[in-house]
Every structure is written in C-alpha cells, then in structure tokens.
Amino acid sequence: IAAGKDLTVGTTKGQLNIAGLRNTFTGYISKGKLDELQTTLNFMEKQQVQYDQEIANIKLDIRALEAKFPRGGSFFRKRIILSEEYFNQNPSDKIAYDSLRQKLAFSEKQLEKIKFDIQATNESIKLIQNPAAGHEHKSAVLSGQNINLLSAQGINIESAKIEASKQANLQAAGLLPVVSEEDAKQGEMRSAINIGGLFDTYEYGQRSSNNYAYMIFNQPSEIYGEMGVNIFAPGQSADSRIVINASDIISDSGKVTLKSYGDLSLTAGQGELYTYNKHSYTKRSGKLKIKKKTITEIKEYNNVKPDASLLSGGKGLDIQSGGNIYAYATLFDAPKGSINLTASKALKLFAVEELNYNKLESHKKSSFLGITYNKENSSNSKKMHTALPSKLVAEAVNTRSGWDTLLEGTEFKTSLEGATIQAGVGENA
C-alpha cells in the first residue's frame, strides 16, 4: 500500500496483522538471493582488506614502541625485556603498549570471524545456484508520510516494510491472542506488539542421502520513520509486552521511542547453513591392478549465525519498560544522540552464540584379491564458537533498572558523556 500523504490503518475490535506472502517452490533457483549474497560477500571482503591493513599498522606501531625497550640476551640473539622497572619509569609506554596489544587481539579476532563468514557466504553462493525446494517470502510494504498503525487489541507484523517519510507510529491498546501450548514451551509469551521476520528456506537433496544441504535466511521486518518511530504498548497488563525479533527499527533524522507497560524483548533470529557430502572412489595398483584401495570421504559443514535486531535513531533511542528489558545481540545505534534504557524491573543485555563447524573424515580400505589387509581412518574437525554481543553506539549511554542489570559481552562505544549504568532505582528498587 502506497499513500501519497498520511496512512492510518486501525482496528476497533480485533488485532492488526501485517505479514509477508509465502511462496513455496521446488526446482527453483533464486536470482534475488544470489544477488543479495554476492553483495554481502563483496562487503565482507572489503572488511577483510581493512582489517588486514589495520593489523599490519598496529604491528608496525608495536615494533616502533618495542625499539625503545631495553634489550638482553646474547650478542647473536637479542631479546626485548619488558621489565616492571622500565614501565614504572615510563608509564606512558606501558599504557601505549597495553593499548596496542588489546587493539591487535581485537582486530585479529574480528578478522578470524570475517574469514569464517566469508567461507559461509561462499558456500551459500555455490548452493543457491542449484535448484532447491523450500519457500521464500515477499514482504508486505506500507509507505506514506505519517504512518499510524493502531489496534484495539494487538499488532502483529511479520516480514513487512513500513516506510514513513515523516513519522511511523504504532500503538496497541490490547493484546494479541494467547500463545499456543507448543509455542509457550519454546519460551514465547503473550504480547501486545510483535514485530518479527519470517524464514526463507532452501533445501537440496534428501535427508540421509550422500549429498544433502539446506540454508535458512531471516527475512526481517523493517520499520522506518525519517523524523521518528514511536512504538507504544500502554495497556495496563503484565502481558502488554513489545517483542522485536530479528528486525530493524530506524529513524535517520529523529528518535526511536519504545514504551511498554510489560516486558520489552529484543531477540535474535537464527540463520543457518548445513552441507553434507559423502563420496567414495577406488584406486588400483600393481602390474595387474589387483591391489585395490577404496577411499570414502565425508565432508560436513555447519554455520549457525544469529540475526540481531537493530535500533537506530539519528537523535537517540529512548526505551522504557514497566517490566523487564531483555536484549539479545541487539545493536543500539545513536552515534549523534543518547541511548536511554529504563526498566522498572531487570535490565539484561545478552550475547548470542555463533557456531562454525567444519569436519572432514577419510576412510581407506586396502585389499588384495578381495581380501582386506589394511584399514585407515582419519578425522579432522574445527569448531569455532563466538558470541555476538549487544552493542551500544552513542554520544552517551544511560541504563537504569529497578532490579538487576546484566551485561553479557556487551560493547559500549560513546563519544561524549560515556555510559551511566544504574541498578536498584525506581519504584521496584
């Protein structure tokens, strides 16, 4: 729906649903997803070059600083002496040296992660060019100047794009339906406003066959208001929650404001790539080719990556909850404004794990005239677990909670006042 001026969509009795359309297919090659993956790969390869250069520059700075350090050892094997006495006499060198070492460790860790991501994206590009079975979603799109989504009950948005040239306003006076027993077992709870993505899936081959693979990508919801985004759940119920899952809430020139009477949850989705390939071949040797070696190779690859939510406000972020605030690997971005997180109860920012697993097995069986005389088995695997943290980028960051504040692997980047974190404040302290 495209409106030249303002657009208001509302319900007076039931809930408001806005969702993408699902397209199921077999034998389909997704040109759109291929282009998207190629764009992602190009971006990551540029990042890799930047980190390579950054690491090289840091190492040069470290060597330049180390040239000032005292030396010891033999004439032929000089070595640097990092003595406590030297650093006590030159505290600025100690600070500079420690800082450079920390920067180097961080950059090397980021480079390793980017290399794994590039590997996963290359694998995805290879796969996506083959016919697949699965489904994709076409996002629902609403555009206008001021967009108002109002509901007497709840608001449910799945894989939709809301684009307002002025403000985007969402308000739910009531609640969405009670979640099913199965969903409740998965940790889902009733809410007033739910904003999330839908999964696109691509499957290749049959399970338990020698060649099998699948890919899962999140198709997020995106809510954009140039002059501001306001999302309110004011209903006086503990279930009056706002849940944002693997989606983007953005205002380039305004503020993003989220307020809920109940809990406010910012959760991450999960993209995944899995491939399995089993291949056997035979080598013969000897004058009569009567010696036979049968080789079976099994390659298995799995990449599981969280799809985080993004909250970005040109003039800041104001997030308030009458209950708890839970954020999983969320990016809070307000480089020219402040970030305010206020929870009447607990405030918890979690990291979410990413998995990269690579395994190669080789089984060799040697035989002569049909009699097996030797077997060799080898296995080489590499597993990398990393945690994608919640990240806050702003001129100032202020967090307040009535109960506990938990910051798990959280990254802060502030340019002016820094970060203010308070626990045990407000009426629930």
What are these regions (language model features)?
Residues I1-A429:
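Low-complexity, glycine- and small/polar-enriched segments
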